[in-house]
């Protein structure tokens, strides 16, 4: 398999996995802590030696590959809401990479969170609040806000709002990596088969 395509598909799986977690949280108000940690940890790996270093929880990544099969394959399980969130994340990513000040602030704030992890777990409410504020302060204002649908009772809870923003930041991190690896929106139309085939093979590794 083409190594660049493998890495790009891995990053795309990371985007979809974080987006699916946003959807699940918005609907049900809860998320497995290990899965939450796996997505949030990707934000903090800013200088990886290789793409696999960003996605260290392979079980969670498998879910991302399955989402690729659903969203880009011939499956009847395409989720319009996931597609809408994906379009929103990719649009904000384009705005972010064109903003030198935004990228600089992002790196600085992520370093602050890394220091905070000397004292707290990444799923601690204080850390999640900081990650959420990074998204609100730097990303959210770059373009149209992503409108999250779900259970109003869940969406009114501050901790759920913060987890959703933190997960959107994780989706953004994977989107930036996907673009750095050569990912383009047109690939999702014209190179779907190659992406789906790579996801299938990655699932069986």
Curated annotation (Swiss-Prot):
Transmembrane segments: none annotated. Keywords: Cell inner membrane, Cell membrane, Cytoplasm, Membrane. It is found in: Cytoplasm; Cell inner membrane. Its main location: cytoplasm. The keyword Repeat does not apply. It comes from the Bacteria. It is a peripheral membrane protein. One of its GO terms (cellular component) is plasma membrane. The keyword Membrane applies. InterPro entries: HflD, HflD-like_sf. Belongs to the HflD family. HAMAP family: HflD_protein (MF_00695). NCBIfam families: PRK00218.1-2, PRK00218.1-4. PANTHER family: HIGH FREQUENCY LYSOGENIZATION PROTEIN HFLD (PTHR38100:SF1). This is High frequency lysogenization protein HflD homolog.
């Amino acid at each position: 398999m083409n190594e660049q395509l493998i890495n790009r598909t891995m990053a795309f799986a990371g985007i979809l996995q974080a987006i699916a977690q946003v959807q699940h949280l918005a609907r049900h108000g809860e998320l497995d802590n290990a899965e939450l940690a796996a997505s949030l940890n990707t934000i903090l790996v800013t200088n990886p030696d290789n793409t696999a270093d960003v996605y260290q929880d392979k079980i969670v990544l498998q879910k991302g590959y399955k989402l690729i099969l659903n969203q880009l394959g011939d499956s009847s399980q395409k989720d319009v809401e996931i597609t809408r969130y994906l379009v929103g994340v990719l649009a904000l990513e384009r705005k972010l990479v064109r903003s030198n000040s935004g990228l600089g602030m992002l790196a600085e704030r992520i370093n602050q969170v890394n220091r905070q992890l000397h004292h707290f777990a990444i799923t601690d409410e204080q850390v999640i609040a900081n990650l959420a504020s990074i998204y609100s302060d730097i990303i959210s204002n770059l373009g149209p806000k992503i409108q999250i649908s779900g259970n109003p009772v869940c969406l009114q809870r501050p901790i759920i709002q913060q987890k959703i923003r933190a997960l959107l930041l994780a989706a953004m991190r994977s989107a930036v990596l996907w673009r750095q690896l050569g990912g383009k929106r047109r690939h999702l139309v014209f190179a779907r088969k190659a992406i789906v085939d790579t996801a299938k093979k990655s699932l069986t590794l």
